[in-house]
């Protein structure tokens, strides 16, 4: 198939990056080397794929959902030994055979699957992470990145920002206007780099699970004070004890609690409940 004859499908949320400066920027921040095994999600017509393959990398494995693009991509890159292609849905495809080989993940994420993609590649609290990614580069919806980077006290702060910041170091590289895509989306995007935190000595899986439990309970009623949300799992006596031992005011709302305070709350809550 000739790429000029291909028409994008709305159901796949296809907005292809055409801004050459941003394509080059992605390659630049990836800091590629001869040992890199790249996973590219949704290569589209291969604009970014081509740039990545022209770098000193070991392998690029691309996963594309749209069957009509498979032949186009194979025709374009079939003679490149570093390239492999798999047709499938990234939300359900089995990556076990290559997961431990992948060093970097790069994707222009369809807005409608941002949450599940973050769960798969950044991870979830309390779930053992079965990967060794050095760097994850996502082009994603700007307002989601705004939420992810929010600190305590911000109206955007929430369970998502705390989870993502506990699991990775995050850096926004730049914002990307709709005109950088074809067709243009209705909103701005942001180019962001996640570096998974592999060995956070403060946390273990059981503590992560408890932090996640506290976050779910608290942010389900984010307008309420902690005292009035955690009373579903703690008695008034336990709440007072936890407030004192953690040095956290329970008259605050969850978005006003720092990450270190959530860790301390979970640690002391576990002690109280033993």
Curated annotation (Swiss-Prot):
SUPFAM superfamilies: S-adenosyl-L-methionine-dependent methyltransferases. It holds the Pfam family RrnaAD. GO terms for molecular function: 16S rRNA (adenine(1518)-N(6)/adenine(1519)-N(6))-dimethyltransferase activity; RNA binding. Transmembrane segments: none annotated. The keyword Transferase applies. Keywords: Cytoplasm, Methyltransferase, RNA-binding, rRNA processing, S-adenosyl-L-methionine, Transferase. S-adenosyl-L-methionine binds at residues 15, 17, 42, 64, 89, 108. It is found in: Cytoplasm. It is an enzyme of class 2 (transferase). It catalyses: adenosine(1518)/adenosine(1519) in 16S rRNA + 4 S-adenosyl-L-methionine = N(6)-dimethyladenosine(1518)/N(6)-dimethyladenosine(1519) in 16S rRNA + 4 S-adenosyl-L-homocysteine + 4 H(+). The keyword rRNA processing applies. PANTHER family: DIMETHYLADENOSINE TRANSFERASE, DIMETHYLADENOSINE TRANSFERASE-RELATED. Specifically dimethylates two adjacent adenosines (A1518 and A1519) in the loop of a conserved hairpin near the 3'-end of 16S rRNA in the 30S particle. May play a critical role in biogenesis of 30S subunits. This is Ribosomal RNA small subunit methyltransferase A. The gene is rsmA.
